[in-house]
């Protein structure tokens, strides 16, 4: 680990963490180690006395005073800086906010000797000695451009202040044009049940006939006040309001992405799952697969049909084809071999075509792939 207190002469005053490894360029590090404060931009050291200064002081005073002396100098410098900044601050406050006047006062304000110096101190470039002129110029708020064009654009810039008023006017006009107000595009959602102290009073307000108290005396709670999970299951009374469901246990320890050539989410497989599986995540709306069927592909056989029925009954989300089946009867224009193969008479209208079921090892997903040889009502659809 290394020591917690690093003593590098110019780096910081006081305890610090070991220097950051990544973001410090080697040159800067070298400067740090040499203790030369002028080059350091990212840390802001107390300025370190250069050897020349130390020598001068040593010439004047007995040696034990040097450090004390230097400290005093530092404090004086800091006080001066502070005073200059304060002065600048007060000057700044007095500038009127109205741009016309401000423009007049700007230039002489910035030519003031104090201001330049104070700006140099507060400059963003670490704590260096004079930063470049360019930096100074960009930092002091500079001269405002003058002339017709810039006037125009400055006005444009302030247009947003008018926006509110204009919007009101516009809405009002639109109201005049149409006789009656339009129905809202999104009607307000139905009011949710209010829980807690005022539930009863609100109930009474809504339907004067039924107080909730009667129901509560019988020990029942009106169904409007029952909370449900997303699926519709009732949340037992007394569950705290915001309790969240425990996070799903996930055997792979937070590894939810696919690394390059390991098929993590399908443990025990050497081959990637089908591109459809990867492309749109079937797992979210798939079928639970009976253990027996894992890893098999059924050409549509009795066994396949049976398993398919079983799977559908266990399906996680409603079968996507159910509403279709109700709506359109199976088409009768199949090629003959499909009808014969199914063993259904041509008129019975029960030709579903063939379906291949694909089960993935180690995952609860099954995909039924319609056989494209025989067009079906589902052909071309993976479900």
UniProtKB/Swiss-Prot annotation:
Region Disordered: start-end pairs: 1-21, 177-254
Family, per entry: Belongs to the FAM157 family.
Protein name as catalogued: Putative protein FAM157A
Organism encoding this protein: Homo sapiens (Human)
């Amino acid at each position: 680990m290394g020591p917690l207190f690093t003593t590098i002469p110019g780096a910081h005053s006081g305890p610090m963490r070991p220097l950051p490894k990544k973001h410090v360029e080697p040159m800067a590090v070298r400067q740090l180690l040499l203790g030369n404060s002028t080059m350091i931009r990212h840390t802001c050291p107390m300025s370190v006395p250069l050897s020349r200064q130390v020598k001068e002081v040593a010439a004047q005073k007995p040696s034990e005073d040097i450090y004390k002396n230097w400290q005093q100098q530092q404090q004086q410098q800091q006080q001066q800086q502070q005073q200059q900044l304060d002065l600048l601050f007060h000057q700044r406050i007095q500038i009127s906010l109205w741009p016309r006047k401000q423009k007049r006062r700007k230039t002489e304000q910035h030519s003031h000797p104090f201001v330049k110096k104070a700006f140099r101190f507060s400059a963003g470039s670490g704590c260096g000695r004079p930063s470049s002129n360019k930096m100074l110029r960009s930092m002091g708020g500079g001269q405002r451009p003058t002339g017709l064009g810039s006037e125009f654009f400055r006005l444009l810039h302030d247009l947003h202040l008018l926006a509110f008023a204009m919007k009101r006017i516009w809405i009002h006009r639109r109201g005049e044009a149409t006789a009656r107000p339009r129905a809202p595009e999104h009607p307000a959602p139905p009011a949710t049940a209010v829980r807690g102290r005022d539930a009863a009073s609100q109930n009474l307000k809504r339907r004067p006939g039924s107080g909730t108290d009667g129901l509560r005396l019988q020990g029942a709670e009106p169904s409007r006040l029952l909370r449900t999970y997303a699926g519709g299951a009732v949340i037992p009374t007394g569950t705290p309001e915001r309790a969240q469901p425990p996070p799903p246990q996930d055997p792979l320890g937070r590894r939810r992405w696919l690394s390059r050539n390991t098929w993590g989410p399908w443990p025990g497989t050497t081959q990637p799952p089908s591109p459809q599986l990867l492309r749109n995540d079937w797992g979210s709306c798939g079928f639970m697969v009976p253990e027996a069927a894992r890893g098999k592909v059924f050409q549509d056989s009795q066994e396949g049909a049976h398993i398919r029925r079983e799977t559908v009954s266990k399906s996680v989300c409603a079968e996507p084809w159910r509403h279709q089946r109700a709506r359109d009867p199976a088409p009768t224009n199949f090629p003959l071999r499909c009808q014969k193969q199914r063993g259904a008479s041509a008129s019975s209208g029960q030709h579903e075509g063939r379906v291949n079921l694909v089960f993935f090892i180690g995952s609860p997903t099954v995909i039924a792939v319609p056989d494209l040889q025989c067009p079906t009502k589902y052909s071309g659809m993976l479900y």
